[in-house]
Amino acid sequence: MSDIFNSPQNKASILTALMKSTTGDVEDVLIPKRFRPAKDPLDSPQAAAQFLKDNKYRILRPRAIPTMVELETDAALPRLRQMVEDGKLKDTVSVPEGTTAFYPKYYPFHKPDHDEVGTFGAPDITLLKQLTFFLLENDFPTGPETLRQVREAIATLQYGSGSYSGQLNRLLAMKGVATGRNPNKTPKTVGYTNEQLAKLLEQTLPINTPKHEDPDLRWAPSWLINYTGDLSTDKSYLPHVTIKSSAGLPYIGKTKGDTTAEALVLADSFIRDLGRAATSADPEAGVKKTITDFWYLSCGLLFPKGERYTQVDWDKKTRNIWSAPYPTHLLLSMVSTPVMNESKLNITNTQTPSLYGFSPFHGGMDRIMTIIRDSLDNDEDLVMIYADNIYILQDNTWYSIDLEKGEANCTPQHMQAMMYYLLTRGWTNEDGSPRYNPTWATFAMNVAPSMVVDSSCLLMNLQLKTYGQGSGNAFTFLNNHLMSTIVVAEWVKAGKPNPMTKEFMDLEEKTGINFKIERELKNLRETIVEAVETAPQDGYLADGSDLPPIRPGKAVELDLLGWSAIYSRQMEMFVPVLENERLIASAAYPKGLENKALARKPGAEIAYQIVRYEAIRLVGGWNNPLLETAAKHMSLDKRKRLEVKGIDVTGFLDDWNNMSEFGGDLEGITLSEPLTNQTLVDINTPLDSFDPKARPQTPRSPKKTLDEVTTAITSGTYKDPKSAVWRLLDQRTKLRVSTLRDQALALKPASSSVDNWAEATEELAQQQQLLMKANNLLKSSLTETREALETIQSDKIIAGKSNPEKNPGTAANPVVGYGEFSEKIPLTPTQKKNAKRREKQRRNQ
């Protein structure tokens, strides 16, 4: 192919497309040199600790974990004994209850590495050459620009997991957001109670109650598994987890699938110990001791996220994932998942700004465009919210706004308010009775926020302070969505200033939440008209042919969760395409087959490439003539290779969502056959008709809008009344109390008929006893709700104790976390006491 490229005519065409010149081989210009990261200066604990100290970042004094001991699974999880006998659970579990302790260590892999670039993260040079070849073979007007963009992406980006320097610099940036020019503020400081935030969330994130069959929040996690060996009745109500993901502390190097039994044992132990502590003579002290004993459940592994980073920022920016301990993830998900699974309410099906559960396919994008055009016609402002993304339509201009390092803006009180919302609006029966007990209320409201917000993380053998919430925890989306809600509410209260004005940016200081304007799309009405009028009349979704359009359609670049809108003449509606920058980056750098189980199968790598090229076509490549032509050719070529090997392609492609980074967006689509126009029709055909005015109102506060609720809170007409839980629970309590009072009145001594003072005194004592019972009942009947509401209103967050380590040399001791030295660390008094108590409990079972 090199000879073809270097012919005088082709060489001139290629250089013209790339806007470059050379007297040598054209491939020297076409193909960028492979990126090799510089030597990482912070790849040792000593260097990292000194770097953090120099930048005044808090290093924690190392805390130890008891050494692992083997227990019989059926003894640790007696309810699941049958699963052990049937081989569904392993015979023994390893739990941290030894008589000595160890310091944990975690050294993540960073690829590509300075010393070994390897094949990981290599750019798709074959696709680049195919693009060049088809550029010469066809006369696509946008072809030169596409080739130039892909080549530029290869030259400036790099897929990989960054570096230690990038991770540490990211920590500093997160601290800068949390404590810098605009320090974080709690909702109370901004001026919101938890009930007021709940009222706002009823508009911005409407939720339903969990299914009736879902167990209440009253049980230890292992009780959510009903197993008898009968497939017709066996069922697990535990939240879904990705079994191939990291198990976190204390099981470093293992997956969730490896440690399911251990996670259940630890989660059970933690929630039970928490329950005992919460009902002890000194609940706060007891809870603190429990958290300290299980400190590792609030320490996440600082995992470098694989992304397409810019090469120039390789040592400056690596996104960190706070890999939560499996038991912590399990407990948090038990609170959120049953509610959110039943709450796919968003702007396309409900009168809410929320985009939760939104899919651009099956008419989703067209619904968004219909709502936008309706707002433009009525000259109304429009707002949409998804996690740390805010979208505002105002004065014919579309604004895409992101919270700056969104997770860093979070405080424990933000998460506490979200827990309050889930319990009072989700985990509550129609009669007002709570579906949770005091133990779970204590965990959700007082303990969980401190476990994942402003907690700690582990990198190398350094235990570090985490500023804001750990990214990737089970509440990341929910907490971010709450913070975006606060920003939008303050925007409404301020009179909806234009996002490009100082008045809008002043909301940062008011809310303690940093944000940035990612996109300003002016003249949106005219852009939409242009997209319709210039829509292609040939090719995919135009004339029904299985070819790309000669000239791509005009995209309405909303940046809506990474998607733009294209008008289809065939379907007479808008359909989604991936944002061009993201599409080009995906084409330039494949992520590779990350599913290790699939990777071991013969032909898996070839199947991955088929999936990759078909996915690129599906998410928007079909609208780019040159990219579509090259990707289609590559896909067909790889299919033939599998056929020659005698491998059935459908065996892989049925599970294609495990291979593609876009699998979650295209769930249910089969790639057993190459993409055709009919494929695009099928994936974009609406499931039902749509009228924006016919969307139902939010379930909890119908006939109210976000503007009305915000205005009511601001004006003082909103009095922060008791929630429905309180009112209905009060009614039930009064009914029970009145019964006792009636009994007391029946015993009331009658002076006209009773002369026996001893008898009268005895009856009076009975009456007083019943009245005391009534009074105690009035208090105890509200205990469950009061622990969830009253405690929250006092902003009480209970956290374990952690001490800063001022000497980085001590924190980075290379002996820490290695061999016999670490295992000879004595247990703390709390660890010793709890180990003895658990051993006694097991003997008594």
Curated annotation (Swiss-Prot):
A GO BP annotation: viral genome replication
Signal peptide residue numbers: none
Location of the RdRp catalytic domain: 384-588
Catalysis: reaction(s): RNA(n) + a ribonucleoside 5'-triphosphate = RNA(n+1) + diphosphate
Main location: virion
Lineage top rank: taxon: Viruses
A single GO cellular-component term on record: virion component
EC number of this enzyme: 2.7.7.48
Keywords: Covalent protein-RNA linkage, GTP-binding, Nucleotide-binding, Nucleotidyltransferase, Phosphoprotein, RNA-directed RNA polymerase, Transferase, Viral RNA replication, Virion
Basic residues composition bias: residue spans: 833-845
UniProt name for this protein: RNA-directed RNA polymerase
Annotated organism of origin: Infectious pancreatic necrosis virus (strain Jasper)
Lineage: Viruses, Riboviria, Orthornavirae, Birnaviridae, Aquabirnavirus
